[in-house]
Amino acid sequence: MTSAPKARIAITYCTQCMWMLRAGWMAQELLSTFGTELGEVALVPGTGGIFEVTCNGELIWERKRDGGFPEAKVLKQRVRDIIDPERDLGHSDRKAGDPA
């Protein structure tokens, strides 16, 4: 029995800007939430102010395009929308003011 391929996340960050810790934190957040549903979370060093996140090759966050860095909950929602759209992310899906 062959299982479906697991998602690959790549976080490309600017080494000149020293964004490795931010990229690592985002990777940790995704791994904590999705665990074994992810096949890989890669940190990819880059330059020139880059901070991009892809899921299975699809660009889901780009710092310049999207106006800065993602909040963890937004990034989790975008990954979820690709790998498991029916999944409830619990508190990460609730808006401010929604009942708990």
Predicted regions and their residues:
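Eukaryotic short linear interaction motifs
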Residues: M18-W19, F51-E52, W61
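Amphipathic, hydrophobic secondary-structure cores in small proteins
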Residues: T36-E52
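Local sequence-structure signature of Cys/Sec-based thiol-disulfide redox active-site neighborhoods
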Residues: M1-F34
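C-terminal helix/juxtamembrane-tail motif
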Residues: P85-A100
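Eukaryote-biased feature marking scaffold/signaling PDZ-domain proteins and nuclear chromatin regulators
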Residues: A4-K6, G46-G48, P70
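Non-catalytic, surface beta->alpha helical segment in thiol-disulfide oxidoreductase systems
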Residues: L59-R87
